[in-house]
């Protein structure tokens, strides 16, 4: 059994990032609801648990009905790290004081480390003129600790949060008000690695080859001799899911590629060629363009569009499954960011942002059980898994594409005309990103961006072409850089590149006369517009 860290989830949107950072340190981690009982915690320790991390939350630590940390967490003798709400709960339950703050902190902050603790000693992003080591971190809190519990010492502070970190090193208890799990906290990865390795004593015995072996064994045990049907979207997630399942059960898997009329330019042909040449998997191509477009007519609300697309996918799969003798499982390439944004995480505590067409809630009429082998993985882990499975890098590192396709990149009602314009504009954008190199890194801008696409805006603007007046549509370009897709920054594309893309779209795509560039980060914006 792997050495492991238990993460107790209190509802933060980024709880799974904690698990990701722990795994990057080569240590296996599991997430469980924060309200597990004492017996569960003691049983975990009896099985060799090395440490516990308490997540953040959107709730208040002193709000009536807020979850409390199981008392056993502080009694079983393993190191504990509290993050944000986890820090406040630790302080409150161990005799400190938590108060509502008039100065709420959301975003970038600079933290001063104190006391030379094992967690923060020697970590600094810059040094002040007075010689104090400072950390660049990400804050997201309203409440704050105003009095340390007995036995604790000050570990960190900010200008507006005098107690931004605390530690009782005799018991191995550490807590920080900021979020070390997000990439905006520059030393966060090092902090978490230091906690699980130096403080908890984990050696780092978890890796992708082990994960593949364990996942293959789980799939075989779960599926047995049953037939499995998997829906291909053309994206990385369903591709890797197909490769993993195929390794586990071979010809028991049949892939169904549904063309809903909302794919990228020539994507249907590319998917069929790619899967036939590289995977040797049974694949069925279904052209359901008329079915999907008909159902979307007159629908403008993004949630309604997603749900319609999800429902139609289910209907198509049900039809195809009925043609397969023995098909009892529907496999999907659902990954964790899909789950967390739908508040479908297994702990069920996160706040919903948007629904995803391939998350939870399959109707009973489908009569298929759900197989989601990538449900606990982030996008970067999925890519790592794909390479380890032997898939071509050019397939694995393709930019992600949402299951609803262009349906959520056309704002408002989806029309065939809009889809055709967007397809061509998007293809030009991606082509130029692939052709343009950054001289500093030698990489193309397609490689330097994590996701890039065009968005169709159903509004018209006045323009001039030749000697004539035009009144045509607008497209927005979106390009982001991110490590885990839970947070993202807009990509600083060179102005000459943006100018070239704009010129080509306006001149080559009749019906578009204005191009704009989206400079919003996540948060507060999501990566997709809908």
From Swiss-Prot:
It comes from the Bacteria. One of its GO terms (cellular component) is cytosol. It holds the Pfam family GATase. Keywords: ATP-binding, Glutamine amidotransferase, GMP biosynthesis, Ligase, Nucleotide-binding, Purine biosynthesis. It catalyses: XMP + L-glutamine + ATP + H2O = GMP + L-glutamate + AMP + diphosphate + 2 H(+). Residues 206-398 form the GMPS ATP-PPase domain. The active site is at residues 84, 179, 181. Residues 4-205 form the Glutamine amidotransferase type-1 domain. Signal peptide: none annotated. One of its GO terms (molecular function) is GMP synthase activity. InterPro entries: Class_I_gatase-like (IPR029062), GATASE (IPR017926), GMP_synth_C (IPR001674), GMP_synth_GATase (IPR004739), GMP_synthase (IPR022955), GMPS_ATP_PPase_dom (IPR025777), NAD/GMP_synthase (IPR022310), Rossmann-like_a/b/a_fold (IPR014729). Its EC number is 6.3.5.2. ATP binds at residues 233-239. Pathway: Purine metabolism; GMP biosynthesis; GMP from XMP (L-Gln route): step 1/1. HAMAP family: GMP_synthase (MF_00344). PANTHER family: GMP SYNTHASE [GLUTAMINE-HYDROLYZING] (PTHR11922:SF2), GMP SYNTHASE-RELATED (PTHR11922). NCBIfam families: guaA_Cterm, guaA_Nterm, PRK00074.1. Catalyzes the synthesis of GMP from XMP. Homodimer. This is GMP synthase [glutamine-hydrolyzing]. It comes from Bordetella parapertussis (strain 12822 / ATCC BAA-587 / NCTC 13253). The gene is guaA.
